[in-house]
Amino acid sequence: MKISVLILAAGLGTRMKSQNPKVLQKICSKAMILHILKQAYKISDDVCVVLSHQKEKVEQVILEHFPNTRFLEQDLQNFPGTAGALRGYESKHEKVLILCGDMPLVKADDLEKIALNESDFNVAVFKAKDPKSYGRIVLKENKIQKIVETKDANKEELAINICNSGVYAIKAQILKEVLPLIKNDNKAKEYYLTDAVYLAKEKGYEIDAVFVNEQDFMGVNDKIELCLAQDLMQEAIKKEWMKQGVIFHMPATTFISDEVEFVGECEVYENVRIEGKSKIINSIIKSSSVIEDSIVENSDVGPLAHLRPKCQLKNTHIGNFVECKNALLNGVKAGHLSYLGDCEIDEGSNIGCGTITCNYDGVKKHKTKIGKNVFVGSDTQFIAPVNIEDEVIIAAGSCVNKDVKKGSLFINRAKEEIIKDYFYTKFKK
């Protein structure tokens, strides 16, 4: 059976205390809604997101990553609530899976289990450790009789610990039947999608409870829950890579984006941050290093090194306080205190302490090319664009502003001068 997915993301998210919409708050360097969409598209080719607050901003972010997504705008003023969000929605498939836009930990397997349950109407539920403000599920022989919102629950209903996750799978035809019947005669004066349960039951449909893990379906409403969700996601990401052979030293101190890929035997030390679509192949990343959207193969990086986007390292050593950006390094040693930006450096070359590729002229970026077996002395500046051929020696303290031919020694220093007794003259001693 094909499934349509509808994601409710129109809420104001006031508890986030942010000018950005709640669903654009970042978890593991990515907007919360994108984590949900990634899972949704694993089970469906028809995904629609309901928006209202800062609609255009959210649409732009979503379409950059998932261009086939449909959108529906909710009229919050006249039709608030989860059922109000569905006004005007048309499903492309026989069954609709409805979930919230603040559930970044949901997995496609669980969503599919809920959607493909044989019942006409399924509700994902969990046993809550602390029911808090969750809607309570009234069950009879594992069939749902009704869902009661906390605001409207009596003392007996509040004692129930089986709670509504906010995820539903319902046949599109049933949805069309019951939606027009939902009223806002409750304390909040909202149109509750939970009312669809008793309305469907009145029409003779059975509503099944599908039990799920509370943690995987947690909603993120404030910065505390945002932090908790990220911690849980980080833990899951690192556990999965450890199962595949990656060694993490003090994993609680490291940050790994969900798009990072490890291949072969890799080792990651404490306080490391690896972001974006980085790929680490048979390499060691030492303490307090940051890697962004870069490829590291058969290399060691750090400690205290920074690879900015578009770096490609192979058989290379990058030491402490070395920053690279858009650098192609093959068989290179850069031990300490250097900036290597917009450059290509070939195998056997050694980059001395304090080397800088001066890549920016105030308007455009320029490239530095360094060939094989080049020895670069300490405190060297390359004024790009510049090309250094193979087997060149650059003397320490040089400012390289022209191309250097193969086998040459390049020296460019200010002429030394010693003025006798200058100290005494200056300070009149």
From Swiss-Prot:
Q: Where found in the cell?
A: Cytoplasm
List of residues binding acetyl-CoA? 359-360, 378, 396, 413
What GO MF annotations does this protein's record show?
glucosamine-1-phosphate N-acetyltransferase activity; magnesium ion binding; UDP-N-acetylglucosamine diphosphorylase activity
- What is the required cofactor set for this protein? Mg(2+)
Q: How is the cofactor bound?
A: Binds 1 Mg(2+) ion per subunit.
Q: Which reaction does it catalyse?
A: alpha-D-glucosamine 1-phosphate + acetyl-CoA = N-acetyl-alpha-D-glucosamine 1-phosphate + CoA + H(+); N-acetyl-alpha-D-glucosamine 1-phosphate + UTP + H(+) = UDP-N-acetyl-alpha-D-glucosamine + diphosphate
The pathway noted for it is: Nucleotide-sugar biosynthesis; UDP-N-acetyl-alpha-D-glucosamine biosynthesis; N-acetyl-alpha-D-glucosamine 1-phosphate from alpha-D-glucosamine 6-phosphate (route II): step 2/2; Nucleotide-sugar biosynthesis; UDP-N-acetyl-alpha-D-glucosamine biosynthesis; UDP-N-acetyl-alpha-D-glucosamine from N-acetyl-alpha-D-glucosamine 1-phosphate: step 1/1; Bacterial outer membrane biogenesis; LPS lipid A biosynthesis
**Which residues does UDP-N-acetyl-alpha-D-glucosamine bind?**
8-11, 22, 74, 81-82, 135, 149, 164, 221, 308, 325, 339, 350
Q: Where does Mg(2+) bind?
A: 102, 221
Which top class of enzyme applies to this chain? transferase
Enzyme nomenclature, EC number: 2.7.7.23, 2.3.1.157
Q: Which GO terms of type biological process are on file?
A: cell morphogenesis; cell wall organization; lipid A biosynthetic process; peptidoglycan biosynthetic process; regulation of cell shape; UDP-N-acetylglucosamine biosynthetic process
Q: According to the UniProt record, where is the region Linker?
A: 224-244
UniProt region (Pyrophosphorylase), positions on chain: 1-223
Q: Indicate the principal place this protein occupies in or around the cell.
A: cytoplasm
Q: Which GO terms describe its cellular component?
A: cytoplasm; membrane
Q: Which Pfam families match?
A: Hexapep, NTP_transf_3
Region feature (N-acetyltransferase):
245-429
For this UniProt record, give its keywords in alphabetical order, as a comma-separated list.
Answer: Acyltransferase, Cell shape, Cell wall biogenesis/degradation, Cytoplasm, Magnesium, Metal-binding, Multifunctional enzyme, Nucleotidyltransferase, Peptidoglycan synthesis, Repeat, Transferase
**Function, as annotated:** Catalyzes the last two sequential reactions in the de novo biosynthetic pathway for UDP-N-acetylglucosamine (UDP-GlcNAc). The C-terminal domain catalyzes the transfer of acetyl group from acetyl coenzyme A to glucosamine-1-phosphate (GlcN-1-P) to produce N-acetylglucosamine-1-phosphate (GlcNAc-1-P), which is converted into UDP-GlcNAc by the transfer of uridine 5-monophosphate (from uridine 5-triphosphate), a reaction catalyzed by the N-terminal domain.
Family (UniProt): In the N-terminal section; belongs to the N-acetylglucosamine-1-phosphate uridyltransferase family. In the C-terminal section; belongs to the transferase hexapeptide repeat family.
Oligomeric state and interaction partners are given as: Homotrimer.
- Supply the name of the protein: Bifunctional protein GlmU
